[in-house]
Amino acid sequence: PYTSQESLDDAAECARLLGCRLDTVGIEPAMQAFDAMLKPLFEGRARDITEENIQSRIRGLTLMALSNKYGPMLLTTGNKSEMSVGYATIYGDMAGGYSVLKDLYKTTVFRVSEWRNRQRPRLALGPAGQVMPERVISKPPSAELRPDQKDEDSLPPYPLLDRILMALVEEEGSAAELIAQGLDAATVTRVERLLYIAEYKRRQAPPGVKIGRRNFGRDRRYPISNAFRTA
């Protein structure tokens, strides 16, 4: 319900550039049905992230239904930044069989998109020239699950977030080392906490390409229970 017309236009342009079929399926009827079903149980409680996640799960259910009916494997769109801090809905946008961007941080996704618009790899199956609309790369990222939502409402700016995550994950550094380098202590500590508590989501994420030094899975696995911390 909160998907902007700009995002719909960008999706149409992306499909056109790639030569893909585009179908638009509104989730409003399903959302209204869930609202009615859960209303007696949610009575007296304000709308919050629960309703946001229901939207994502309805999308995941719809996409999986199309995958079942027509056969193609559903790909997830989450990147390493989002999966690191749990900025994804389990059984929602995490639903799928393969995660193409699983080992790419958000800032790297932007750089790869810009590169692909300029280059066509020799073995690529896609078209030459631009394949990603510039506005998709340049506009503020948003899950669009509530009015005027931006990723930075919940997370540090991606350049800062990725710097922290690369140090903690790829380099196996510590929060104390980052703080000693001059980064804001509250921000670093919060990102580290999110990294730990999102472990249960990552365990249920689909497999994907390994590109970096340490991907989530065999390279980096931590206990889920008992509020585990390394220090």
Set out the residue ranges of the language-model regions:
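ATP/NTP-dependent adenylation/nucleotidyl-transfer catalytic domains that generate, transfer
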Residues: P1-A231
